[in-house]
Amino acid sequence: ISVVDYIDRAIEWAAKYNIRVLLDLATVPGGQGDSNDSPATPEAVAEWHSSTNGRHVALDVLERLADRYGEAESLLGIELLDTPQMSVRKSLFTMTDGIPAHYLRNFYRDAYELVRSYMPEDKIVVFSSSGHPSEWKHFMRGAKYKNVYMDLHLYHYRDEYALDITSPRGLTTAISRNKRELKEAISTGFPVL
């Protein structure tokens, strides 16, 4: 059974049981650096942006998904890329590993245009905050962008407190961080998942 057959089934079942499906491009050639399979997975690399065809393959897959399912009543929308690791400023002269923010922004704009050409405006288009919600404050704010959501993805297994997450201190720290990130995300003006 192909992946498309499983998606077809999910769309059919969702229609039957009156639920909605959010399709998510979970991985891309070269990797987007999320490695969110399990805490035991080694740190992933984000080489997708520097591969010769990674961007084109991702856009092709998104176009195929939007073309096939964009009009389905049970489709909630499409998430353009799942938790890519974005490169951010570490200090005055250094950046963290990951995909440059300008590359992600350009990809998201191009992907939005592509999927929106197949999907009506009542379907949502979702982009990942990449763990830095405040970096997206003025992004996709023009009138041509309709029904755009930000995915926050509050993960903890890779942060500095992951080993202590079950202790009172670890839980307090995680809750505090979640509140801060959620507040930052809401301040961008996007609906937040």
Predicted stretch roles:
Residues 60, 67-70, 74-77, 81-193:
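Extracellular glycoside hydrolase catalytic/binding regions
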Residues 1-77, 107-114:
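An active-site-proximal structural segment forming one wall of the substrate-binding cleft
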